[in-house]
Design a protein with these regions (language model features):
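Charged, low-complexity intrinsically disordered segments
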Residues: 2-165
Length: 165
């Protein structure tokens, strides 16, 4: 583990405070939807969680097929801005994100182990591009993705504790 990178992205102000992961880069890149982890979701295989998420914005089969072929998460995100967005997207996008992110960690044991290794750290999807819904920008935001990751981690920790009883 690169201690310099850890000190840049995992901060603590005092011994009593929980550590904080403030960026999904370096050793914490695996938390990002841009991380190259194949995921099976809704009967399809996706190269990244980003591609799966962007594809779920639409009910157009051709647009979903196009996104399924995309390996580069930045391209998937860009293409996701061009699809015909389903009417109920705002109501379902959080549940979709949760399902996709859970599938990523359920299906990739080494990633689940890495998530568990964050222990009780606060996970923030810190960004500079202004996403205050899924993350935190300039100290502001709902951090929905970070919250999903912490809830998943807590669920996995609960499973581990049950297995060890």
């Amino acid at each position: 583990m690169n201690s310099r990178r850890r000190s840049e992205n995992m901060n603590t102000s005092s011994q009593q405070e929980r550590p904080k992961i403030s960026a999904f880069e370096g050793e914490f890149h695996f938390l990002s939807n841009f991380y190259p982890a194949v995921v099976e979701y809704r009967g399809r295989r996706w190269w990244t969680t980003e591609a799966a998420y962007q594809a779920m914005k639409t009910i157009n089969e051709e647009e979903q097929n196009m996104l399924q072929m995309v390996r580069a998460p930045a391209l998937a995100k860009r293409l996701g801005k061009t699809v015909a967005v389903r009417r109920d997207w705002d109501e379902i996008k959080e549940a979709i994100m949760r399902e996709i992110v859970q599938a990523k960690f359920d299906q990739n044991a080494f990633l689940q182990d890495m998530l568990l290794a964050t222990e009780d750290a606060i996970i923030e999807e810190g960004n500079w591009w202004g996403d205050t819904f899924w993350g935190i920008c300039k100290g502001q935001g709902l951090n929905k993705l970070g919250n999903i990751l912490m809830e998943l981690r807590d669920g996995y920790l609960g499973q581990v504790k049950k297995e060890n009883i």
